[in-house]
Amino acid sequence: GGSIPVVTIDYVHYSCSAVSSNNVKCMGELLDYIISMGHKKIAYIHGQDFSSVTRDRLAAYYRALENHGIDIPEEYVREARYLETEDVAKQTEYLLDLPDKPTCIIYPDDTAAIGGINVIRSRGLRIPEAISIAGYDGTRVSQMLSPKLTTIRQDTDKIGREAADRLISIIKKPKTALVERAVVEGILLER
């Protein structure tokens, strides 16, 4: 005894139960949609923390491109800290300065996408005419933008309920508690 019951959300640790979005499936669906819209030059600014979330999304990005027979230059894959608009702005500038610019940029979260939009618009480029963008989170703010942001909406209510249920179960029946992983599906919001 004496250990504190823990359930993590969107972070996998070997000794704790975890509840997370289906990052692999959702990123695959997002890329399938972007590719179906005619894009082949797709950049991805990913989180810098190398958590399981970052690794899963990055692997799914590469896997989806491979499944579609698309090769992208290594410089299309950039790092920026999650929710860090200044980092994202620098990486967006870098991508826009490339001689062979991407036609679509995927951001690690919707807040980052908003930072990217500001950089793109400051250059006089129109979205989606000059360049397309996509986010990941499905925040309310991202759906108030014009044009609305293509993104993956994470079912945060379901993730929270699932985590709470697992935590209550661990507290009530510690002797039968197992380290489990639960995955909650996200929803592609096409715009």
What are these model-derived regions, one by one?
Residues G2-R191:
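Bacterial carbohydrate/catabolite-sensing allosteric modules
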